[in-house]
Amino acid sequence: MKRFLQQLLSVAALACLAQAAVAAPTYVGVKVCTKCHDLYGDAWAGTSHAKAFDSLKANSKVEEKKKAKLDPAKDYTKDKDCVGCHSTGFGKPGGYTLGKDPGGPERLGSVGCEACHGAGSDYRDEHGTAEKKLLRSQQSTPRKLIAGKGQNFDYEKACAACHLNFQGSPHKAAKAPFTPFTPTVDAKYKFEFDKAVRTKALHEHYKLKGAFEGEPVPKIRADFQKTAKDIPE
């Protein structure tokens, strides 16, 4: 009887793990995000993050690659040590996979929306629901709801995962494969979060309507909202 109970508990535990794995948020891609956030998408499309995958191609960024002791004539688009920081969700459910069309409908072959905001399958519908609630009853939705469904608000950590992922980095979570593009190679690779996001924002910022309230709130949000544009009617 005891053995039977142990086996039963083991099966139950495995079932829970399987359910958790199935429930993990997946990446949906830029096209899904920009169905509603089209203005942000248009602004992002002109940034270097939108074109990040192109720099892995042969004969692209020649001088930069030479400085980092890489071969400018080599195609790095299928190098797993490079692709992770030039795509969205590499190695994660629904994320970019080697050989996938980087410019396909999802545009996962770029540093897109979810590279900063997190895999969107679980929280994206909550945005629509919250906006309808705001319009209907003038009530905001707790931001912790979308945070609990995978939306990321720790932008500094998201940036550091690539921009500070080199040997000797001050970023404690830095780990192999390390980027060869370090401040010792060229001073332009020195990354300071506050300075970088203010001088090279990843997209235009628009005034928020108040669909969500409460923590977590990125510390830079208040500054961006001071100069944010009104959303055109």
Label for each model-derived stretch:
Residues 86, 117, 163:
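Helix-to-catalytic-loop junction in kinase catalytic cores
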Residues 139-171:
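Repeat-solenoid scaffold signature
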Residues 1-12:
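Bacterial N-terminal signal peptides that target proteins for export
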Residues 22-109, 120-152, 182-233:
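Sequence context of c-type cytochrome heme-c attachment sites
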